[in-house]
């Protein structure tokens, strides 16, 4: 059994992590921390977890206790993992960070986007970007894993086959993405109130979203060079889900794009390339660690449209974190994650 610790268990990614790990046969959650909720039982805060964590209570973070775990997940705001990750790594504990702290390889770029100096730049060279469909082999031997963000996961998985094959015009990529309100976190915000978010949709951060440099970094790796990306996120009146509509110019009309995508993801347990002509729905991935993709070439022209959907809390966060843990410790990648999506 793997002894697991969780730092920051009171947000949506934290409770989703608890839900997924409760179904995992090789895991014992030994400690979960929250300074504000120390002493509160997990099952009292989250009634859906009654019968799974009845003896577990939130506690103040203690490096010695966390350092006794095989792996510690950080489900925290950015900046928190900077302070603790190095100490845990020195104790021999593996770290899987769901925040943005180690996703960008350039500390100065991270500081520009997150408005504060990077707190552990010395750890960036060894941080492995935890997108299994790209970095599976590096994940196996990692000490520190940076779990990708929700928008970056859906966008990169949608674009990868076109960029890796050299088919797309890398200078003119567009990602038009929609997110459920849970992507804004559990904290009280006016824009997340029911009366504000219901029956309305809006674009935001068009000038520049924090996920833009992360997406661009991944697409550059796939393309082997610079890319030009326009990324426009939207907030939609649903709780869970990311729907990415991706546009790329592909001049070669002789390529069988359906076959290209099917071949690229044939061995990937959590990427579903849907039949030609499909339109994946966010409800088809709700609660599941899967990305569903459909590729289109409207009117047979040069513009290719890729539709990519995920659950932002699962494949876009906690589910992908568990997938990384499974790979890291040599377990079946599907362990604890094989359940179907919820309908309706």
Curated annotation (Swiss-Prot):
One of its GO terms (biological process) is L-arginine biosynthetic process. GO terms for molecular function: N-acetyl-gamma-glutamyl-phosphate reductase activity; NAD binding; NADP+ binding. It is found in: Cytoplasm. GO terms for cellular component: cytoplasm. Its EC number is 1.2.1.38. It catalyses: N-acetyl-L-glutamate 5-semialdehyde + phosphate + NADP(+) = N-acetyl-L-glutamyl 5-phosphate + NADPH + H(+). It comes from the Bacteria. It holds the Pfam family Semialdhyde_dhC_1. The keyword rRNA-binding does not apply. Gene3D superfamilies: Dihydrodipicolinate Reductase, domain 2 (3.30.360.10), NAD(P)-binding Rossmann-like Domain (3.40.50.720). Keywords: Amino-acid biosynthesis, Arginine biosynthesis, Cytoplasm, NADP, Oxidoreductase. The active site is at residue 150. SUPFAM superfamilies: Glyceraldehyde-3-phosphate dehydrogenase-like, C-terminal domain, NAD(P)-binding Rossmann-fold domains. PROSITE patterns: ARGC (PS01224). Pathway: Amino-acid biosynthesis; L-arginine biosynthesis; N(2)-acetyl-L-ornithine from L-glutamate: step 3/4. Catalyzes the NADPH-dependent reduction of N-acetyl-5-glutamyl phosphate to yield N-acetyl-L-glutamate 5-semialdehyde. Belongs to the NAGSA dehydrogenase family. Type 1 subfamily. HAMAP family: ArgC_type1. This is N-acetyl-gamma-glutamyl-phosphate reductase. It comes from Azotobacter vinelandii (strain DJ / ATCC BAA-1303). The gene is argC.
């Amino acid at each position: 059994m793997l002894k697991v610790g969780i730092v920051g268990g009171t947000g949506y990614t934290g409770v989703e992590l608890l839900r997924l790990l409760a179904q995992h046969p090789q895991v014992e959650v030994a400690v979960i921390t929250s300074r504000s909720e120390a002493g509160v039982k997990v099952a009292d805060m989250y009634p859906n977890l009654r019968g799974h964590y009845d003896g577990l209570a939130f506690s103040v973070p203690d490096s010695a206790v966390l350092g006794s775990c095989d792996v510690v997940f950080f489900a925290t705001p950015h900046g928190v993992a900077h302070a603790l990750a190095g100490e845990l790594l020195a104790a021999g504990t593996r770290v899987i960070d769901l925040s943005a702290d180690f996703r960008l390889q350039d500390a100065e770029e991270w500081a520009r986007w997150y408005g504060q100096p990077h707190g552990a730049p010395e750890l960036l060279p060894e941080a492995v970007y935890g997108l299994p469909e790209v970095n599976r082999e590096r994940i196996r031997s990692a000490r520190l894993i940076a779990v990708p963000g929700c928008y970056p996961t859906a966008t990169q998985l949608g674009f990868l086959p076109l960029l890796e094959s050299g088919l797309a015009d890398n200078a003119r990529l567009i990602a038009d993405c929609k997110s459920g309100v849970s992507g804004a976190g559990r904290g009280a915000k006016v824009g997340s109130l029911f009366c504000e978010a219901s029956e309305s949709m809006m674009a935001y951060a068009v000038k520049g979203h924090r996920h833009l440099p992360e997406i661009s970094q991944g697409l550059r790796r796939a393309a082997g060079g610079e890319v030009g990306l326009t990324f426009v996120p939207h907030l939609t009146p649903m709780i869970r889900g990311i729907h990415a509509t991706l546009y790329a110019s592909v001049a070669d009309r002789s390529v069988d794009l359906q076959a290209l995508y099917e071949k690229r993801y044939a061995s990937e347990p959590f990427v579903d390339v849907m039949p030609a002509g499909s339109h994946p729905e966010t409800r088809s991935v709700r609660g599941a660690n899967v990305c569903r993709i459909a590729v289109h070439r409207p009117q047979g022209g040069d513009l290719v449209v890729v539709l990519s959907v995920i659950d932002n809390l699962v494949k876009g966060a906690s589910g992908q974190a568990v997938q990384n843990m499974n790979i890291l410790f040599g377990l079946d990648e599907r362990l604890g994650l094989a359940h179907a999506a919820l309908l309706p």
